[in-house]
UniProtKB/Swiss-Prot annotation:
GO terms for cellular component: extracellular region. This is Defensin-like protein 10. It is found in: Secreted. Keywords: Antimicrobial, Disulfide bond, Fungicide, Plant defense, Secreted, Signal. Belongs to the DEFL family. Disulfide bonds join 31-73, 42-62, 48-67, 52-69. Confers broad-spectrum resistance to pathogens.
Length: 73
């Protein structure tokens, strides 16, 4: 009886460790909105990212020739 209890305990601990290491860190969702202040066709994501903080966003990127600002929701 003692051996089977130890075996069950060891198996349970192994399963718990397996699941604990399989979970990764959780990231916040990213919300995007078209920029209101960026003028012209967006070809360079760096210039888009520089325009977005003035609109209250943390960054930005070009997509479909338009500047989209982003921040954590």
């Amino acid at each position: 009886m003692k051996l089977s209890l130890r075996l069950i305990s060891a198996l349970l601990m192994s399963v718990m460790l397996l699941f604990a290491t399989g979970m990764g860190p959780v990231e916040a969702r990213t919300c995007e909105s078209p920029s209101n202040k960026f003028q012209g066709v967006c070809l360079n994501s760096q210039s888009c990212a520089k325009a977005c903080p003035s609109e209250g966003f943390s960054g930005g990127r070009c997509s479909s020739l338009r500047c989209y600002c982003s921040k954590a929701c």
